[in-house]
Amino acid sequence: MAPLALHLLVLVPILLSLVASQDWKAERSQDPFEKCMQDPDYEQLLKVVTWGLNRTLKPQRVIVVGAGVAGLVAAKVLSDAGHKVTILEADNRIGGRIFTYRDQNTGWIGELGAMRMPSSHRILHKLCQGLGLNLTKFTQYDKNTWTEVHEVKLRNYVVEKVPEKLGYALRPQEKGHSPEDIYQMALNQALKDLKALGCRKAMKKFERHTLLEYLLGEGNLSRPAVQLLGDVMSEDGFFYLSFAEALRAHSCLSDRLQYSRIVGGWDLLPRALLSSLSGLVLLNAPVVAMTQGPHDVHVQIETSPPARNLKVLKADVVLLTASGPAVKRITFSPPLPRHMQEALRRLHYVPATKVFLSFRRPFWREEHIEGGHSNTDRPSRMIFYPPPREGALLLASYTWSDAAAAFAGLSREEALRLALDDVAALHGPVVRQLWDGTGVVKRWAEDQHSQGGFVVQPPALWQTEKDDWTVPYGRIYFAGEHTAYPHGWVETAVKSALRAAIKINSRKGPASDTASPEGHASDMEGQGHVHGVASSPSHDLAKEEGSHPPVQGQLSLQNTTHTRTSH
């Protein structure tokens, strides 16, 4: 490759990071809610992801539970600071809800999990830049895509100008305004509340109402206008959930925002993080129990069948980044305090389902569609189109919350056929001949490790103090998208990981802990990049110094590509 081309490749992530920063500044200046939503420690976290933590003088043995992006980021910054880190992952792969499907025949990719990052997520952009990942534009909106409701089909550039043509009996003051503008009309009262009450009190008020209550009540929208928002903007997924959560989500998810994606697939992010680690990453290693003592934490993991033996690892500190349902399956001794148990039970995960269909050619290009999404009131709800020159693997359906119920319980074949029917209804029967008969379905509510797509809280039924997951329980710390705002985004998981890492790095641990012969710090020093879980029932990680343990399903960067799933 020519030197000039190499220089350009190096500059791509830097330039995109600068563009994202400028886009964020422009969007922030226009969004009156941005200041209220902004994390007070955001700039500090940005510095940590850029420069790392201060080098520790007292390395600690840290066990990170979960190899999703939160666990991997925390492991990286703690390892870089000099701590001895081991990651335990119950699944047979890394990445968590970052899950890239790769078609073995065509090379086309589809994102079963995370697929975009808004320009306001500067921490995530900086992380990708630091790992050498190339970013490019994610097309959220294309004016030539379609909206079909009540058997009326219009191009989205028409819907933006005259949404009443879809058949909604809008009030005179609602007609001629885009769905986004109608939503902003409803937020006028919320803006007044922000100015009168301040962010803290206003958000507490918003947490007590559903989005539907607010839009019809204080928002003073007509029922047809609210139905329009539900059909066209998928706001119906929030209708019975907290208005505060809807506000947070809308600050990151709008067709008017700018988004980026990772060139080559989002799974390159966890792979890049993995390659930067020096400690153990154990797969197929579900944590079943934790016992805190005065000097360390004993972590029990279950080995793979048929033995199902328990093994014990010791650490000075544990960071729990697993999903809420996974954490609830762990036995804690002493038990988690009541307020933490209640906080875990309060976590409300909504289902999320994606259905991809593979076609022989990108037929949507003939309709001048080069990305973005179409909307339908049929079961598939949202259809996302891949960018030009990236194949014909179509995200034929993306549903979440109550809308995902349409695909629950269906067989893989039934789910594919249902999505195909909806695509054919929108684009014509010719798509049936163009479908190559293959596809992939991912239902996150049925994933045994996440048991849900992401967290969105319902209204608070009574006044409670906000759950503060940044406060550790003894030697146990918490991170993950469920522990911070806004829920459901990769950057949120990263922010939570950085906060936990800062606290762990500043913790004053006894020097003797780091050299304990009963711990596993010595194993980590001797083994370097060993990935897998011990398969021998009698193998004791704490006693194997300077040698590689037997591994089961050894992980490498080459075998993390994903085959078709039947979920």
UniProtKB/Swiss-Prot annotation:
Keyword Oxidoreductase tagged: yes
GO molecular function: L-amino-acid oxidase activity; L-phenylalaine oxidase activity
PTM note: N-glycosylated.
Alphabetical keyword list: Adaptive immunity, Cytoplasmic vesicle, Disulfide bond, FAD, Flavoprotein, Glycoprotein, Immunity, Lysosome, Oxidoreductase, Secreted, Signal
Annotated disulfide bonds: 36-199
Effect of residue 102 to G: In an ovarian cancer; decreased L-amino-acid oxidase activity
Swiss-Prot/TrEMBL GO biological process terms: adaptive immune response; amino acid catabolic process; L-phenylalanine catabolic process; L-tryptophan catabolic process; L-tryptophan catabolic process to indole-3-acetate; negative regulation of T cell activation; negative regulation of T cell mediated immune response to tumor cell; negative regulation of T cell proliferation
Record's subcellular location: Secreted; Lysosome; Cytoplasmic vesicle, Secretory vesicle, Acrosome
Region named Disordered: 506-567
Cellular component terms (Gene Ontology): acrosomal vesicle; extracellular region; immunological synapse; lysosome; sperm midpiece
Binding-site residues for substrate, renumbered to this chain: 116, 398, 488-489
Record-linked Pfam families: Amino_oxidase
Compositional bias ranges of the Polar residues kind: 553-567
Listed EC numbers: 1.4.3.2, 1.4.3.25
SUPFAM superfamilies: FAD-linked reductases, C-terminal domain, FAD/NAD(P)-binding domain
Induction per the UniProt record: By IL4/interleukin-4. Expression is up-regulated in numerous cancer and metastasis: expression is induced by immune checkpoint blockade.
Essential cofactor(s): FAD
Effect on the protein upon substituting residue 92 to D: Increased L-amino-acid oxidase activity
Functional note: Secreted L-amino-acid oxidase that acts as a key immunoregulator. Has preference for L-aromatic amino acids: converts phenylalanine (Phe), tyrosine (Tyr) and tryptophan (Trp) to phenylpyruvic acid (PP), hydroxyphenylpyruvic acid (HPP), and indole-3-pyruvic acid (I3P), respectively. Also has weak L-arginine oxidase activity. Acts as a negative regulator of anti-tumor immunity by mediating Trp degradation via an indole pyruvate pathway that activates the transcription factor AHR.
Name recorded for this polypeptide: L-amino-acid oxidase
Organism: Homo sapiens
